[in-house]
Structures are given as C-alpha cells and as structure tokens.
C-alpha cells in the first residue's frame, strides 16, 4: 500500500524561490526527530534537489527492494534519552538527487514526466513506521504541486477520523515559508490561496531570514526588514509560528565546516601555517544541530506542530 506506515504528511510550501524552504524542512525534521518522532523528508524539487547536499549524503544511493525504494538514512533512532529529553526518532530522506548518475546532471523534464516521478515517489518508497513525512516542494504552484495535491488527496485524508478508519496517512497540512520582504510575501499569499483551493489546511507561517544572529554572542540584529510574514499571516488568518534569523552556525553545519571549538585564543601562539588542523566534529548531524542558534526556535515550532496536528486543530 502506498505510504504504508506514514501517519502524518506535512507540506513545506512557498510561492517564492530562495526563501529557505529546504533548510526549514531539514530543521523541522531534525527538531521533530529530537522530540522522539520518526521523520521522513521527501524532496520533490525535481530540477533543483538540495536535500542530499544539506544532509551531507550526496554520494548515497537508493536501494531497490521487493517493497520498493528504501529511503536514505540520515540517522537511526536513539532509544537512550539524555537529560530528560525524549528518545531520538529516526530520520530518512528521499530525493531525485540520489537517483542521478552525476550530481551535476541537469533534469530537463516536461510536465508529464515530472508528474510520473512524483507519483512514483508517493507509491514506490517504503518509508516504514514514520510519524511525520515532510515534503520539500519547489517554489510556485507548478506541475509538481498539482500532481502532489492530486495524488495526496487520493492516498491520504485531511480528516483525521477518516484517515484512521481507512488506514490511510493524514494530510495534516502545509507550513508556508516566507522572508519579511513584500516581494516574497506577495507570492506566498498565492501559495496560501493554493491551499484554500486544494482544501489543504494551512498549519502556519514561518518568517525565515528575519534578522541576523551574531555568531559570537547570539544577539539578533535586524539588518533588513522584519515582520512582513507576521502581518501576512494575521491578514490571512493563519497561525504565525515565528521568525528565524540568519544563523551562521547552521550555514557552517550544512556546508560541512563545523569544527570542535578550541579554548586557545592566544595571540602569540603558533602562526596559521604552523597550527595543526582543527579537529572535525564527527557527531551525527542531529547532535551537531543542537549547537546552532536556530535550534531553540525550531524546537518550539516542532512542539507547536505536534500539539496542533495531534490534537486535530489545523486550520482549513
């Protein structure tokens, strides 16, 4: 059965490109995992799949089994809770990027082929037990979105009672991502209208790149405008989940540049040429993410979404 084992499906949408949908998707997935939830990421940005890169698994390959494709594991579950935190859930992901022969290959497909690929992603991937499947989408309301909505409304249900009685996943709703600027919010309003027309509940709005987090002290400075996402959410009657400043640490994390902090700041120490290479942090991605400034914000987003979805209070 398609999507067998998946409980809840959450779309991550934006009408504007470059607002950080993929980074928001990954951070939501990591935060949900740290709340003890088993999470999957489905990347349907077919012409620009970025999930393999930002999880550091560009060279991973998909395994074909009699049950379908097995998604790539980002990290396994961890049943040993620490400091009173819930046990860590597993995180798996699926992307066209894992199926390309070369990471630099261009995907030049017309609508019917894109539609067929999305249908295959939704029917032929063996996710296993998954509490939340996050779907990272391309910008706009293109062929991918239409195919996704049509297929999900067939395979899943937005009504939790119907989903439970029929043994289907619940299409819990969509998280809308924007930046504060009017040029972004105007396009995201169209995405909200797409949700209304397809009857997909809007779970909330995240205002990404709202300010800049100082990597030294953590203070947030509003270098550009802020608040546009909140105003838009209030006007549309959608829950405003919060703002996310630019986080240099998260950028270093997904670029694979995070190193173990050193206590040595002496000016008269060895020269740069003489200094040994700084030790690389080999902890799993999810554990390194907890050191990022943005983690605390996404932890709250994850808790809000869990409460909202599992209590059945998503707004239509």
UniProtKB/Swiss-Prot annotation:
Cofactor binding mode and count: Binds 4 [4Fe-4S] clusters per heterotetramer. Contains two stable clusters in the N-termini of nbp35 and two labile, bridging clusters between subunits of the nbp35-cfd1 heterotetramer.
Pfam families in alphabetical order: ParA (PF10609)
A Gene Ontology BP annotation from the UniProt entry: iron-sulfur cluster assembly
Residues that coordinate or bind ATP: 15-22
Requisite cofactors: [4Fe-4S] cluster
Sequence positions that bind [4Fe-4S] cluster: 214, 217
Claim: Lipoprotein is one of the keywords in the record: no
Keywords: 4Fe-4S, ATP-binding, Cytoplasm, Iron, Iron-sulfur, Metal-binding, Nucleotide-binding
Cell compartment(s), UniProt: Cytoplasm
Region annotation (Disordered) ranges: 260-285
MF annotations from Gene Ontology: 4 iron, 4 sulfur cluster binding; ATP binding; ATP hydrolysis activity; ATP-dependent FeS chaperone activity; iron-sulfur cluster binding; metal ion binding
GO CC annotations, alphabetized: cytosol; cytosolic [4Fe-4S] assembly scaffold complex
InterPro entries on file: Mrp/NBP35_ATP-bd, NUBP2/Cfd1_eukaryotes, P-loop_NTPase, YlxH/NBP35
Function: Component of the cytosolic iron-sulfur (Fe/S) protein assembly (CIA) machinery. Required for maturation of extramitochondrial Fe-S proteins. The nbp35-cfd1 heterotetramer forms a Fe-S scaffold complex, mediating the de novo assembly of an Fe-S cluster and its transfer to target apoproteins.
Quaternary structure and partners: Heterotetramer of 2 nbp35 and 2 cfd1 chains.
PANTHER family: CYTOSOLIC FE-S CLUSTER ASSEMBLY FACTOR NUBP2, NUCLEOTIDE-BINDING PROTEIN NBP35 YEAST -RELATED
Family: Belongs to the Mrp/NBP35 ATP-binding proteins family. NUBP2/CFD1 subfamily.
Name of this protein: Cytosolic Fe-S cluster assembly factor cfd1
Name of the gene this protein is made from: cfd1
